[in-house]
Amino acid sequence: MGCVRNKIVKRAARTIAEKYFQRLDSTFDHNLLVVQDVAVVQSKKLKNEIAGYLTSLYKKILKGTYNKVYIKSHEEERERKENVIPKESMLDVDCVEVDDVTMEMIKRYGYEGNFKVYGM
């Protein structure tokens, strides 16, 4: 059974993950050094808890199972993928290729358009 972490640890780790995501790693020792450089925490126990939660948080973010952290580079990449415009629209095609069954349905319902049966 895992350790339940308090709000201070979670909030500090989330803030560090948002601001310094590029410096993080999937190892506890590396993240402990990042916490020591970035945060002003006097307690050794609290530093270790933040670094441990930061390590698990980093792994969850890489997997894509944790959505509560806003990382600027990830958001820019997501927007770039969403804004891709195809060179040729599917709606602007002169002739739509359909299979035999679909062509029979089109004729039965009386739809008009430029349909063509493609060969298999």
Swiss-Prot record:
Domain of life: Eukaryota
BP-aspect Gene Ontology terms: translation
Keywords for this protein: Cytoplasm, Ribonucleoprotein, Ribosomal protein
One GO CC annotation: cytoplasm
Signal peptide limits: none
Coiled-coil portions: none
Keyword Ribonucleoprotein belongs to the record: yes
One Pfam family recorded for the sequence: Ribosomal_S17e
An MF annotation (GO) of this entry: structural constituent of ribosome
The keyword Ribonucleoprotein is annotated on this UniProt entry: yes
Cellular compartment(s): Cytoplasm
Family: Belongs to the eukaryotic ribosomal protein eS17 family.
Quaternary structure, from the entry: Component of the small ribosomal subunit.
Protein name: Small ribosomal subunit protein eS17
The species this protein was found in: Encephalitozoon cuniculi (strain GB-M1) (Microsporidian parasite)
